[in-house]
Amino acid sequence: MSFRRNGNLSSTLLLIAANVLIPVAIVIFATGFFPYKPLLPGLAQYEPLDGYGEPPEAPFDKLVFMVVDALRSDFVYTTNSGFKFTQSLIRHGAAIPFTAHATSPTVTMPRLKAITTGSVPSFLDVVLNIDEGDESSSLASQDTWLAQMKAKDTGKLVMYGDDTWLKLFPGTFDRADGTTSFFVADFTEVDHNVTRNIPGELRNDDWNTMILHYLGLDHIGHKGGPRSPHMVPKQREMDGIVSQIYKAIETQDHLKSTLFVLCGDHGMNDAGNHGASSPGETSPALLFISPKLKGLQKNQDSPLPDAEDFQFYSTVEQSDLAPTLAALLGFPIPKNNLGVLIADFLSIWPKKADQAYLLHENARQIQTVISAASGTKTFDGALPAESCASPTSDYEQLACEWQGPSNNLMSARVGDDMDSQWALPVVTWLRKAQELMSGMASNYDMSRLILGQITALLAVIFSLSAAIKTVSPTRSLTPLLVISIAYSIMMFASSYVEEEQHFWYLATSTWFGYLTLRGFKRANTTFPAHLLLTAFPVLASLRLLRAWNQTGQKHAGTPDIVKLFIEPHPHFLWLLVGLTYFWTHRQLVYSFHGRIPVPINYPVMTGLVLAAFTFKAAFTLEDAPELVVEFVKSSLLDFTRGASLIARARAVFVGLGLVAMAAMGFILWEMRGAGGNRKRSRRKKGPAEAITTLQHLYTILALTQSRTANIPVFLIFNLLYWFLSSEIDAPDGTGLSTVELGISSLLLQYASFFAMGGSNAISSVDLSNAYNGVSNFNVVLVGILTYVGNWAGPVWWAFGTVVLLGEIWRRDQRQKRLGSGNNGKRGSDEKEEEAEAKQMLEGGQISPFKTYVAVTTLFTAFSVAAVMAACTILRTHLFVWTVFSPKYLYCVAWSLVQHLVINVGLSGLLFWLGSF
Amino acid sequence: MPLVDPVTMSSSAIVKGAVAQSTSTTKSTPGSQATESSTTTAGSSSSLATLRPVQIKQTPAAQTVRHALPAALTALYLLRFDALVTNPVPVMLNALPVVAAFQMTYALLCLPAAGEPASKSNRKPRPGEKKKGGDIGSSTIITALLASVLTSIVTPFLYFAMVLFGAPFLTHGSHTFLCAAHLALLTLFPLFYVHGVDSAAWAAVGGFRAPLDETFGGLVGGIVGAWLGAVPIPLDWDREWQRWPVTILCGAYGGYLLGRVLGGTLFWGKKF
């Protein structure tokens, strides 16, 4: 018997080991997969270049940098654009147009980093983009053209628009007015707040850099896509601002040497979203505007016909902005720049020596970056000829190829007579260096990738053996293994990663089809038609969930229930939303019934639910006003008029916290009383019911953090939950087993995530509820709110599972008591008897919670190992940064937060509280 | 029924024969017997525990048809595949009567009709028996017609089941419905022909307790095949055949044929 006890202990130890190894593997792998790029510290200075004189004189001294968020190239350049004035500038040569290639991830913060530093931001910046308060994403300490303009000390820096700039450059701007983009329904106010500052600033002559960042066009894209009826009017509005600034430059003396740059930070796809790397998303417009540029004689055709690939005029890299601005405005190129001076502007400098200087400075600066990255001093002296015959690394190859361009520069410097194409080899070399340094493939730390992989495989082995030891009979693990293995295989195909929801939908429907129809096994003679009647609502619920939000990549934006039935019928939506809140209210009141007197219970819970509901209504009025019906506006919002959204959200959170504390108080109080006879009647149910209170309180939190159109989904969840609960006490002792519940929970957690609009794309992270009740940015709070906002469904199912696990536990306790009463009848199975004897010796059976953790750990270990293997093997795949890396980040969220924190930590705590 | 309980609970301990015995003792009460139209006419072995695998008739015609028809179905499918990909609805519609004729021939020639003694070859013909195996009498034709009526009744339900498992609901209605009709004709028609509306037999089929044979094997294969047919749809290969419902139909046919052949040969009589 002591051996058996050891068996239980060893399975617990294996389980703990697996759960320790999972985060360890994730961290090791991440450090190898997202390598930390060495950043050169400090501000670049002009260093004397051998043989050159002073740096060439810059044609401009002031900069107006106007960013229009999501300004895709065709919005400016094509026939149906609203930028008529800008197009006339292109025709007259006063505007030099480009298509600036933006690398993935095409979201604002990494793009601004690329634009200002000239470097290619690491993929981790995406995470930091969400986690906007992170200090390490701040560029205040890095070398950027803003820092250089400030160091020039020829004027102040002013900024109006998206407050991402303020977060990236704290303390840099002398005058600033940041706008936030919480509500994408705001098309006008957010831009008006920028525009109203322009006339005054154009009259001021105390600044040398003015940054304007307009968000309205991006909002229109998110809301209505690139063909929204608001799009062209917004373009005309932006065109008007271009005209306003250009005319000021033309007419006002203190602005005559002003360079005006108009650009988008990224583009958008046909659905109006961005984040990935489709041509639409990676092709923003970029224009350099000034009357002085007419001298370049670059008069180009405009407008142009539509282009499928969004490439208009010549295409440059977004990072090329940094060295080009450095040359045009006369400051040293930022230290970590990988951009290449745009050669079209070279002819501004009439002397070849000046042109050579600028190119040479660019090359030398990139060589410094290469030397830092490769850890060698490749460019210090001439390389021995033999090592150039067979270069050992890409870096060496590059160093060898430097000879030719370097000779060209030398000749240009001394004024040799050369053909007009002399600069071409230099630019080609620079592009090559840029490509090499931007491609991160060479930066993987293979040993760490493999170490992480091995650790994850160990976690798989541990969790597998723990599950086999914990679960009996072992064959009940088969469905879980099939799911885990199929999922693991799927991770290697990019389209299955993009369309992961189909896997969960099909698996969930099949599994619930099995659960509802397994009663056929009990039915011996008669055809159990009633089972079909149970199966129908359950499967229909799952079908509704599947169709609620269209997610994934391929068919993103195609009709779904939200678009077809919810948005056109707001009355119907609010009926369902009201029903959801009403139902939660009912359950909340019921779970407190008998604990607190009705006169207190009822008003308190009503107040809490009403606060949550009015917050949701008020939030929707800001976020999606077209969804709010008159009834909700007049009846519910009017009597709480004046309360700000932050105050409303805080009221909800504080109320939830207080009621949760009360519920916890009841649990602890009843736990204490559980020992005495006095509370005997309540002993079985007391804390268990308080746990359901916490479950309902979480439901309110989940509703608060979910999009309004997703709220009715919780009614469907309730129906499925009710089915699972009824299956626990199915007749004939064939009730739901813990493993079956674990599998159901796993499937529903994933299916609900996708059903509520989640996907494996970074762009699908929903930030609309991330700032509820938060006025000052707080990483922890915003992080939690973001997580609950996106994983509302999965966390709901984790709560639900704990309550159901408690029910299973009590059912088994009951059956054990019954079984020990008439052991003779039940003891037909020798094994079972033995197991029972063992359990009695140990004073308890295997806790259902342990079995549940074994189930979720097994799947998590499999998924982590599979995603790592896919990322390692496909690290040179075209989609590694757009499909597999985002999947890795999602996998991290699922395994660290959803598995470890929610399914193990939170559920464990709740199960423990409820088991007294 | 108190006796059911020990049976279900002790399935692993008692050998199968014992289960069968205890079940048949439960079932041999006259009341329950009378309400069922059972697969066999023999009294003591009428209950579910002895639901026998369907045996293909031993006549030369039956044996020829048994092997020829799967080949013919495969050939038909391969011949029409390109047309199916470009124009699924008319192709499925036109193929329906052909497949129906195939299945009808198969049922009439090879399968024992419901109500007919199931496994004559195993036992001596009883004295009261009217027909010899292999004859296509009027009663078997009526059984076949009834089976086809039942198949068409069940097709809408199959359609809804497919929708519940993710088939498009608002679009592609005729695609899915025809696909369901094909699936029903392949997998359910033979079962209706051999079991009729015998609820015990259908409960056994639904509970995956029926022994494998050509009919049940075909059902399992067809449904699993159709289910697996959904797998390649999300792949980004952008092929024409990835369109709804080509892969589903392909899986259904492949699975059905495989299940039918394997169920009739290698796994005949085995249970899950």
Curated annotation (Swiss-Prot), chain B:
For bias type Polar residues, the affected ranges are 21-31
Locations listed in the record: Endoplasmic reticulum membrane
Membrane topology, from the record:
Multi-pass membrane protein
Q: Name one GO cellular component term.
A: endoplasmic reticulum membrane
Task: List all membrane-crossing ranges.
Answer: 91-111, 145-165, 177-197, 215-235, 248-268
User: Which InterPro entries is this protein grouped with?
Assistant: GPI_biosynthesis_protein_Pig-F (IPR009580)
Alphabetical UniProt keywords:
Endoplasmic reticulum, GPI-anchor biosynthesis, Membrane, Transmembrane, Transmembrane helix
Look up the domain of life of the source.
Eukaryota
Pfam families associated with the record: PIG-F (PF06699)
**Where are the annotated segments for Disordered?**
21-48
* Any one GO molecular function term: mannose-ethanolamine phosphotransferase activity
Biochemical pathway: Glycolipid biosynthesis; glycosylphosphatidylinositol-anchor biosynthesis
Q: Where is the composition biased (Low complexity)?
A: 32-48
Supply one GO BP term. GPI anchor biosynthetic process
| Family of the protein in this entry | Belongs to the PIGF family.
Q: What does this protein do?
A: Acts in the GPI biosynthetic pathway between GlcNAc-PI synthesis and GPI transfer to protein.
Q: State the protein's name.
A: Glycosylphosphatidylinositol anchor biosynthesis protein 11
Which organism does this sequence originate in? Answer: Neurospora crassa (strain ATCC 24698 / 74-OR23-1A / CBS 708.71 / DSM 1257 / FGSC 987)
User: Its encoding gene is what?
Assistant: gpi-11
